[in-house]
């Protein structure tokens, strides 16, 4: 089939690669414009643009596709059979959604209608969801409200961060989208109601859970929260959760909540530390112990093990290297919050 592909981050690249390798004709790739990134703030293409150029695909980079009528006309003139959208980052206008005869299909990283909108991977971890997945959804004007053609679930591991979960979902999204293409092609064009019947889609309820945009305040750790809440924030917002260590910003990159009921899901090193400190006996944020695997810190309830972190101006470190870098001693305290 002739496919118009829409995507921006590295998460979308496996789907582009998979469709290209399967022999589908990628008639165009639409992605966000180049942005300044990194310490040098150099103008850099999106991961999807970089890969599309390697594949020799025509690339389009509208700043605002809803306002760019010239770009809309160029894209519609490509006469794609179908549009495939994976984490593009802009809302598509009605004319773009309705132009391909076989529709616009989105690979969404959640179990719809839970976590519609941006950041479904982060929010599934932040809220402690036991599982998530990918849905191949027909796009309509509502935000992630369209009927779902294919869906696959996977469990979320306690010690899995958003990047790791995103990599698994990215591969799953690519596989499901490839499975969806012959089904969509076989159903053919036609009236919407007839197509949905032929495709046997699952219609979503009107009500759903929306993933709100994250703010800077969301990334600040509060040691007065429970160990599990702090851990979910560290893993869900990886690598952005921050606190203060001796007036310097500290990124906390990996933790384990030292909670007895979760012991089976912890590492051997963390499991050996469970139950060694009285719950609530120390002020939040106080260093309780320097272990080979990192720092044990008090919270509201059970303590938490910081396995990996990055002090402002330093390289990331873990275990004993982290303790040496911070020169941490029992009784030292982490700040309640820091500017991200």
Swiss-Prot record:
Pfam families, alphabetized: Formyl_trans_C (PF02911), Formyl_trans_N (PF00551)
Protein's job: Attaches a formyl group to the free amino group of methionyl-tRNA(fMet). The formyl group appears to play a dual role in the initiator identity of N-formylmethionyl-tRNA by promoting its recognition by IF2 and preventing the misappropriation of this tRNA by the elongation apparatus.
Full protein name: Methionyl-tRNA formyltransferase
Reactions that this protein is recorded to catalyse: L-methionyl-tRNA(fMet) + (6R)-10-formyltetrahydrofolate = N-formyl-L-methionyl-tRNA(fMet) + (6S)-5,6,7,8-tetrahydrofolate + H(+)
EC number: 2.1.2.9
Keywords (A to Z) from UniProt: Protein biosynthesis, Transferase
Family classification: Belongs to the Fmt family.
């Amino acid at each position: 089939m002739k496919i118009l592909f829409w995507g921006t981050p590295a998460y979308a690249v496996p789907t582009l690669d998979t469709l290209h390798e399967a022999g589908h004709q990628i008639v165009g790739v639409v992605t966000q414009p180049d942005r300044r990134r990194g310490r040098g703030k150099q103008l850099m293409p999106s991961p999807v643009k970089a890969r599309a150029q390697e594949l020799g695909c025509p690339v389009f980079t509208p700043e605002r596709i809803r306002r760019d009528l010239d770009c809309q006309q160029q894209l519609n003139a490509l006469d794609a059979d179908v549009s495939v959208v994976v984490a593009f980052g802009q809302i598509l206008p009605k004319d773009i959604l309705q132009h391909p005869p076989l529709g616009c299909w989105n690979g969404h990283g959640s179990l719809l209608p839970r976590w519609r909108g941006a950041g479904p991977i982060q929010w599934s971890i932040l809220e402690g969801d036991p599982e998530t997945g990918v849905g191949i959804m027909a796009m309509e004007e509502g935000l992630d409200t369209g009927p779902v053609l294919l869906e696959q679930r996977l469990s979320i591991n306690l010690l899995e961060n958003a990047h790791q979960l995103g990599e698994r979902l990215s591969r799953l999204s690519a596989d499901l989208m490839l499975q969806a293409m012959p089904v969509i092609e076989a159903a053919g064009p036609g009236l919407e109601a007839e197509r949905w019947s032929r495709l046997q889609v699952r219609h979503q309820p009107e009500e759903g859970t929306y993933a709100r945009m994250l703010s800077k305040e969301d990334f600040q750790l509060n040691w007065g929260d429970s160990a599990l809440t702090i851990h979910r924030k560290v893993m869900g917002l990886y690598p952005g959760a921050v606190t203060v260590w001796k007036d310097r910003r500290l990124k906390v990159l990996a933790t384990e909540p030292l909670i007895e009921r979760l012991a089976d899901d912890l590492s051997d090193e963390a499991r050996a530390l469970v139950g060694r400190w009285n719950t609530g006996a120390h002020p939040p944020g106080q260093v309780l112990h320097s272990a080979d695997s990192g720092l044990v810190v008090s919270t509201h309830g059970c303590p938490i093990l910081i396995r990996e972190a990055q002090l402002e101006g330093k390289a990331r470190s873990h275990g004993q290297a982290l303790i040496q870098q911070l020169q941490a001693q029992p009784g030292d305290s982490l700040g309640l919050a820091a500017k991200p």
